[in-house]
């Protein structure tokens, strides 16, 4: 369902407001953190694709993220040919998290990764993909340190 097709109910607003309050308490303490969401899809167009919508990520950083994710997948025993990695702004995506970027938490963060994982990665290959994603997420800190060390004046993600 597209974001503009969703029906917003008073109960949904109440739950979201409560969630956003907790989010604010955590995120506002350290806005240098990456915000990460993991979702799943079963869309036929993305059967063998891991799509990553982003916030605050330029093309150079997206290339680094894609490379680090491929390395993490390989380390977890997943063939690079098993999955097509699509990441904004380098690739077009089916799932762009547009509603979340417009009205959700992604609207309020400096940097974010919103992952849409295909069904087989969440079911048949769950242990391998879980290990790969954990390794990838741990590597985000080293990416930040590398960017900080290269250019202390940099304001890019």
Language-model segments: which ranges?
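N-terminal catalytic or cofactor-binding beta/alpha core of small enzyme domains
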Residues: 1-157
């Amino acid at each position: 369902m597209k974001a503009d097709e969703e029906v917003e109910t008073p109960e949904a607003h109440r739950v979201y407001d409560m969630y956003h309050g907790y989010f604010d308490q955590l995120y506002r303490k350290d806005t240098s953190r990456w915000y990460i969401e993991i979702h799943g899809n079963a869309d036929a167009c993305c059967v063998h694709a891991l799509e990553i919508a982003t916030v605050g990520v330029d093309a150079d950083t997206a290339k680094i993220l894609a490379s680090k994710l491929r390395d993490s997948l390989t380390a977890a025993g997943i063939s690079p040919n098993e999955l097509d990695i699509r990441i904004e702004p380098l690739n077009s995506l089916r799932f762009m998290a547009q509603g979340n970027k417009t009205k959700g938490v992604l609207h309020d963060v400096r940097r974010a990764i919103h992952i849409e994982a295909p069904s087989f990665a969440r079911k048949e290959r769950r242990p391998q993909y879980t290990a790969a994603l954990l390794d990838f997420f741990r590597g985000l800190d080293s990416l930040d340190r590398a960017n900080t060390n290269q250019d202390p004046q940099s304001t890019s993600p």
